[in-house]
């Protein structure tokens, strides 16, 4: 099946006798289900008496239900190999559950409990109140997120979208048990909800269980009746606004009106904003990030939904002195869009982006359910099933008229956040007229876009037959291929999929670097994406967008992976581009400079984010300052010192034939995979170099406890240490299970004790990472500064208890089932599968190691866990850092 043959079957709809709408979409490709319960209440439907209550209820429902008291849901779901979570936005509260399909009945029972059998207590309210206040503080400590929320509150005047979803410290503090219970009973009713199911199921069985568990749910007296609110666009006035934030690097935000999702011209403005500001192909990105190099990044946030809202274009300036220039470039590019500047070729590529994204959204159960639910809110599911036709029908003149009608200069708002206002004084004189008639830069030439397709290797060259010994079948679905130049290809065949995942991995990585060339692997492999001997970077962008594939590089400590995803009919084109950038990169100095400047700005901004800053300080305690185990890019000074010649020299290490592994996952025959890969890679002469030498560098601090005070209003505790190497497979597997028990998902000890029992922490977690020679672990707690001592004591108590008494059989089983379940969910993603296989084989493992993951997890015993804990978690091995 090819992408041009792609058709989406319509989801079925059913109403229970109580009025609850059930939407179900059958996809039997994997034995999984995703179920989403949507309650049509979010922050946009709250008033001044209940700000943040919808989000508050989302927290409280998990605390206790009739059949699952004491947070039992958070244990039952992972024990059955599933995952459950929830979110609240402007329009709804959504509870979403991923489970093996054989757990359908249990899944529906659990969601029904959340829907109408929650029985939280005043004590629960008190604990969650403290947690939500910490969550609000966490957002306030994010300079970019906090700035976005400030713009949200200033931009809207009458729209309920101006209020934060979490509420405020004041509104949450005053929330009482009775008011919250009333909010739950009033809004959590079948007439104000719907359920979406995507995955593998039998319809008769599904409807039987829906009626059994959701049938008793009834509207209460005075129940909320959902109504579509006024969708009139809010008229804003031109505004220039400066906001002071102590210690903040600079951020610039410019707003543009956004139409409600159900508006007939919402897609027209979506195309316009993509042309202007979304992605690396947008005009603003190419001007400000790539050409002028005065912005590190440009992001667009959408504050919209059922109601019309706003798009916030967020600019991260590099250094000082560029704010006026950024605003002028924005004015120029907006002016060009208004004056017939978009040509058919540019529009065609944006349409391809949108349509390809729509097709990819059906790759996983969760994405499919989310897409169906979004259209249910918009009130027009027809659009979901015919999105390609809707997008193809949009005309250039319609887009221009939409821009003229809705992106008026007099409604623009410009916001600037900084720790000083010196630069703001240079732009305060800007008026509406500067956007109506901006000074245009005659030197800026419009980039030509060619839709001429790359040579189709599948059709222009004869099929290359495989020799008798070049394809070996390993199992029912897996094959190994040997190309004529000895390059190894691993292939997994999955039937009836239009998607292909591919990845090529090498153990050439940052732990081959020394103090003299830190960051060279990151910079080299990042620059390889920016043009080849045969295609410039803009041409590669256009080709990938036209054919609907993407290429990216992933930097692990011990491997580097180039990975991507495409449609099966475009695999020859995608692999040809991949082979070009790997073997014949140009290392254009313009793009090297762009990567360096953007990366260095991001490194500078890291210290603005307390969570990132705290982890860096902890990692320095563990590994020292002269290490190659921290971030892949190295430091700012190390990046500055690297030159084009350094990159070319490092690239020579990428010509190791025995180090490469190309992995592909798709529905093409193994013989055709051989033919395609032989064309793209098989004719390249490769040299037989010696094995890669990994040299991890680290020197721990003699001080194992450090406290830093920055008055951030929160405390961040990092506690961790070294762990066993990945080469000890048995212990490594045991540590992954141990990590889940201590601080993994909602069933972990850290979550249950620090968050649920005592309410000290808004967020807890436990991370574990390892390479062949060393591993390290890190646990973290975000809490109020006054709770640092009891939080640290509880965390140390958890670790001490496990070292002395081990874990329970129930904890072991839950963690095993959870890890196996998550692996199955991840396997829906063909790109993830390909990169996982390539990564392991590049490190010297065979395919059996990948295939036996579940068996290794099942074989871990309580004794293995106890031994592992006592090897690495004892108090004398802890490195503790506290930032407050």
Model-derived segments and spans:
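Extended, domain-scale alpha-helical bundle/helix-rich regions
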Residues: 401, 405-414
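Histidine-acidic residue clusters that define the catalytic metal-binding segment
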Residues: 2-13, 154-193, 205, 225-231, ...
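M16 family metallopeptidases and their MPP-like homologs
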Residues: 25, 30-44, 52-56, 70-115, ...
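His/Glu-rich zincin catalytic helix
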Residues: 1-72, 109-111, 181-287, 327-328, ...
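Short, conserved secondary-structure transition motifs
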Residues: 133-139, 229-244, 350-362, 566-567, ...
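Short alpha-helical functional segments enriched in proximate histidine and acidic residues
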Residues: 60, 114, 118, 139, ...
